[in-house]
C-alpha cells in the first residue's frame, strides 16, 4: 500500500535538529548542491563523468534533439509508377479496376497509398487519383497517355 504521509523521525526526538547541526542546514536544497539537475556542468561534473556516457555526458548534460508532435507529422505510404503498372495488371486480371474512355481509373487512397513517385516505367494509359504526386511521376503517366488528378484530403 502506498504511504500518503511523510515519515516522521524517532531518532533524537529530544534534540532540535536531529544531528544536522545549525537550524536550517537540513532544509530545502541548499545542502545538496541545488534542486534537481542543477550544477551538472559545475560542481556536480563528477556525477556526469561517473554515470553518463563517456565524452558526451548524456543523459545528464547537453541538447537531446527534437521529437515531432504526432498530429503534425504525416505518415507517407508511397508507391512508384512501375509498381503501379504491375498492380494495375493484377487488378485488371481480377476485374477490380474500372475503365473510363479507354483508360484505367485508380484511386490510390482506396489501395492504401497516399503518394505517387516516379520510379520505374508505365505503358498503360491510367487516370490516377492521389493526394500528392512527384513531377517525374506525372510526366511518365502523361507520356503513357494517362493523367494524374490531385485530390485534397486531410492526411492523418
Swiss-Prot record:
Comp. bias regions, Basic residues: 1-16
Q: Which InterPro entries match?
A: Rbsml_uL15_N, Ribosomal_uL15, Ribosomal_uL15/eL18, Ribosomal_uL15/eL18_sf, Ribosomal_uL15_CS
Which molecular function term from Gene Ontology is one that the record holds?
Answer: rRNA binding
One GO cellular component term, please give it: cytosolic large ribosomal subunit
**Domain of life, source organism:** Archaea
GO aspect biological process, one term: translation
Fetch the PROSITE patterns from UniProt: RIBOSOMAL_L15
Q: Does the keyword Ribonucleoprotein apply?
A: yes
What SUPFAM superfamilies has UniProt attached to this entry?
Ribosomal proteins L15p and L18e
- Gene3D superfamilies xrefs: 3.100.10.10, 4.10.990.10
Which keywords label this protein?
A: Ribonucleoprotein, Ribosomal protein, RNA-binding, rRNA-binding
Renumbered to this chain, region (Disordered) spans 1-37
What does this chain do? Binds to the 23S rRNA.
Quote the subunit structure annotation: Part of the 50S ribosomal subunit.
Similarity section: Belongs to the universal ribosomal protein uL15 family.
Q: What is the name of this protein?
A: Large ribosomal subunit protein uL15
Q: Which organism is it from?
A: Pyrobaculum aerophilum (strain ATCC 51768 / DSM 7523 / JCM 9630 / CIP 104966 / NBRC 100827 / IM2)
Give the gene symbol.
rpl15
